[in-house]
Structure formats: C-alpha cells, structure tokens
C-alpha cells in the first residue's frame, strides 16, 4: 500500500512540475503569436538576444492606425553583383541608392531571399520573402549601425519580371558572385509598382536582424501587398538556399502600426 501511495504522490508532483513549467512558458510567450503551438517554444533560446526580435507573426486585426510613418525611396537601377552565399541568394547594390525615414538617411546595401517567408500574417506563411537591407553609415567598428529593412512577401502566381532578370545569373558554386552589367537587372521593375508606393500599404514595427548577431536596431516595413512569382521561380531560389527562415519571435510589448 505504501508503494502505491508513493507512486501516486510522485505522479502528482510530476504533473504539478509540468503544469508549472508550461505556465511559465505561457507567461513569457503569447502562443497565439505562433502558427503552431509548439512554434512558441523555439523562442525560448533566443531570449538572450532581447525582447525586440524578428520575425514576428503580424496580426492584422491588432494593427494600430498609422501614426504617420513614411519612407522615401531614392534608388538607382544599379545592382553590381548577384551572389550565391549558400544560405541565401543576394543582390548587391552600387553606392548611391537611399531610403529616408524620420529624417534619417539609410544607404541601400543588398537584398536577399528567405524561403519560406519569415514574417507571418495572421498565422499564414508565404512561400518566399525578400528583404531589402539599408543601413546608416558605419562610423567605426564600435558603433552599432541602424537598419531599415523592407520586407516583401511573395505568393505563387504569374511569372515575376524582376526575378527573371537575374535568376540565370546566380552562380552555381556557393560563396561566389557574378558581376551584373549596367541595366541588366532593373530595380524599378520591382519597386515602381503602384501598390508598393502607397505609404499606407505596409506594416511597421521595431525589431532585429533575423540572422546573427540579431541586432535590435531595425525599423521593419513589411508591405501588405503580396507580390507574385511563379512556382518555378520560387523553387529555383529555394533549391539554392534551402529552407532558411528563422522561427517567429515573441512580440512582447511592441505594437505593429
């Protein structure tokens, strides 16, 4: 009889500990921000990077009214190289293209891809996401630059003219680049769309880089307009970089507007 009582007490203690552990996780993470309940658990190891991490699940029904955020693009159709970095496909910009936000000018540096998307919208994942990365000037190695990243989501659909311009230029070998002739890849074929130039057509929030060192000095602008790319185009990029999306992170006290 004593063995039975001991076993019951041990079982109850185990259940209590499990319940407490689960409650701690729920206290830290809003599981509803994850597409799947277990996805929230991936956030735990990243807490050491801070509470303003990216990407996030953007809940459109909780979006605040825009408070006047506006970005101004001043870009040139000057992409100097296409790189196969192994973990992503990257296009490098020549100097001279900028984006301005709240009086700060950021220099276009590069754009790259994630398959599938890193950001979610109302729990929905998209097959691909493009990031256009801009930074403030690097003053010295001890200064952390500020970043402005434009996120563009893609769904499967018609062939994308901009992607077609460089897909065949991507080097086969990892960690190599291919120079781009002037005018061969036209950024205007991507950014001149009416939808992308509507200042009300994006989600904004403060966050981080989605790759090491996960720096938390990023102004994120994720466009609401979902662009199209053919399944073959998306598969071609995924075949090079694989599945390279970071798990979504807790939003904590931040808001999306």
Language-model region placement:
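Bacterial N-terminal signal peptides that target proteins for export
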Residues: 1-8
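Residue-level signal for mature regions of secreted extracellular proteins and peptides
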Residues: 13-14
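Alpha-carbonic anhydrase
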Residues: 21-257
């Amino acid at each position: 009889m004593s063995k039975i009582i001991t076993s019951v007490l041990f079982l109850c203690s185990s259940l209590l500990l499990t319940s407490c552990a689960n409650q701690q996780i729920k206290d830290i993470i809003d599981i509803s921000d994850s597409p799947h309940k277990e996805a929230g658990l991936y956030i735990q190891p990243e807490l050491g990077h801070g509470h303003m991490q990216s990407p996030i699940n953007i809940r459109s029904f909780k979006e605040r009214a825009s408070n006047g955020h506006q970005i101004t693009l001043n870009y040139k159709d000057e992409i100097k190289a296409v790189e196969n970095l192994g973990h992503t496909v990257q296009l490098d910009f020549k100097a001279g293209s900028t984006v301005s936000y709240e009086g700060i000018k950021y220099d276009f540096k590069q754009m790259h891809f994630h398959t599938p998307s890193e950001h979610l919208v109302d729990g929905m994942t998209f097959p691909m996401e493009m990031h256009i990365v801009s930074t403030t000037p690097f003053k010295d190695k001890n200064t952390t630059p500020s970043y402005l990243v434009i996120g563009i989501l893609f769904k499967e659909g018609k062939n994308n003219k901009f992607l077609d311009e460089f897909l065949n230029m991507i080097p086969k070998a990892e960690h190599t680049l291919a120079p781009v002739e002037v005018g061969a890849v036209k950024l205007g074929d991507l950014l001149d769309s009416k939808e992308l130039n509507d200042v009300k057509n994006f989600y904004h929030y403060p966050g981080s880089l989605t790759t090491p060192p996960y720096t938390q000095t990023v102004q994120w602008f994720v466009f609401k307009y979902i662009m199209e790319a053919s399944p073959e185009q998306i598969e071609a990029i995924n075949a090079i970089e694989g599945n390279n999306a970071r798990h979504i992170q807790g939003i904590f006290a931040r808001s999306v507007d």
